[in-house]
UniProtKB/Swiss-Prot annotation:
Pfam families: HSP33 (PF01430). This is 33 kDa chaperonin. Redox regulated molecular chaperone. Protects both thermally unfolding and oxidatively damaged proteins from irreversible aggregation. Plays an important role in the bacterial defense system toward oxidative stress. The lineage of its organism: Bacteria, Pseudomonadati, Pseudomonadota, Gammaproteobacteria, Alteromonadales. It comes from Shewanella woodyi (strain ATCC 51908 / MS32). GO terms for cellular component: cytoplasm. It is found in: Cytoplasm. Under oxidizing conditions two disulfide bonds are formed involving the reactive cysteines. Under reducing conditions zinc is bound to the reactive cysteines and the protein is inactive. GO terms for molecular function: protein folding chaperone; unfolded protein binding. InterPro entries: Heat_shock_Hsp33, Heat_shock_Hsp33_C, Heat_shock_Hsp33_N, Hsp33_helix_hairpin_bin_dom_sf. CDD domains: Hsp33. Keywords: Chaperone, Cytoplasm, Disulfide bond, Redox-active center, Zinc. It comes from the Bacteria.
Length: 286
């Protein structure tokens, strides 16, 4: 079965739309950079699926960041991406994590920040407290505050696969609560195994076989890291030459690693001289 796709669909006889995302390869690439424990693997999987759903829902051209921060064992979990469904993510934690801990146990007192940076127009940022036991619940609260449209979100992850569904009332006139609640009840019956193992068409048929559903062409979701040797060189340029020379004297080279993909960039004294003379550092060392 083809994985790593986002599927959009509409109900022909109700002013409600939906999305379904199934992830495997992109999820594994996010996890491969670090030896995450199971609770973090599941958290990042759900967050990856959620960011894909949000990217399609919020309809923008540019970059998106969904970041969870807290004072608990997990201090940070973030997925960054763009409207092309190119995503990357990382988490930071300390100590032992409870295998059955909910979102509040993982993050303690925390919040979620959703940032949209369009290629044109103003940057938008929304913040919601992590005061629900699940990520899906916090995202539903975000939509209640920002979009003010009834929205239902379902998220699953197991360390190998991640998946999610989003249901939302279309912004049209009239009261659509009854039809939304009916479809929400049907959607709530979906099982993780169905989303992990079945094609999207089969999942939708099982859930909504008495409804008329229009399914659009899938959009591929990929892992894509934006790190590069040039970006690392630019970061070095922001540090004082004196400090950089001090590190070189002590360590012989400057090592810079990407948290997202674990790629390491190495710069020696010749590279550093080129950086500070505003010429491109040689491409031979990485």
């Amino acid at each position: 079965m083809s994985k790593d796709n986002l599927h959009r669909y509409l109900f022909e006889n109700a002013d409600v739309r939906g999305e379904l995302v199934q992830l495997e390869q992109s999820y594994q690439e996010v996890l491969s950079a670090h030896n995450y424990p199971a609770p973090i693997q599941n958290l990042l999987g759900q967050l990856l699926a959620a960011t894909s759903l949000l990217t399609a829902t919020l309809k923008f051209n540019g970059d998106i960041s969904v970041q969870l921060q807290g004072d608990g064992p997990v201090s940070l979990a973030v997925i960054n991406g763009n409207n092309l469904q190119q995503l990357r993510g990382v988490a930071r934690f300390k100590g032992e994590l409870s295998s059955d801990g909910d979102l509040q146990q993982l993050f303690g007192k925390g919040h979620m920040v959703i940032t949209l940076t369009p290629t044109e127009g103003e940057r938008y940022q929304g913040v919601v407290a992590l005061d629900k036991p699940t990520l899906a619940g916090c995202l539903e609260e975000y939509f209640a505050q920002s979009e003010q449209l009834p929205t239902s979100i379902t998220l699953f992850a197991n360390g190998k696969q991640a998946a999610g569904m989003l249901l939302q009332v279309l912004p049209t006139e009239g009261d659509h609560n009854a039809e939304f609640e009916h479809l929400e009840q049907l959607t709530a019956t979906v099982k993780a195994e169905e989303l992990f193992e079945l094609e999207a068409e089969e999942v939708l048929h099982r859930l909504y076989h008495q409804e008329e559903v229009r399914l659009f062409e899938p959009v591929a979701v990929t892992f894509s890291c934006t790190c590069s040797r040039e970006r690392s060189a630019s970061a070095i340029r922001t540090v004082s030459r004196e400090e950089i020379e001090s590190i070189l004297a002590e360590q012989g080279k400057i090592e810079m690693g990407c948290e997202y993909c674990n790629t390491n960039y190495s710069f020696d004294s010749i590279d550093v001289a080129a950086i500070f003379s505003n010429t491109q550092a040689p491409e031979t060392k990485q």
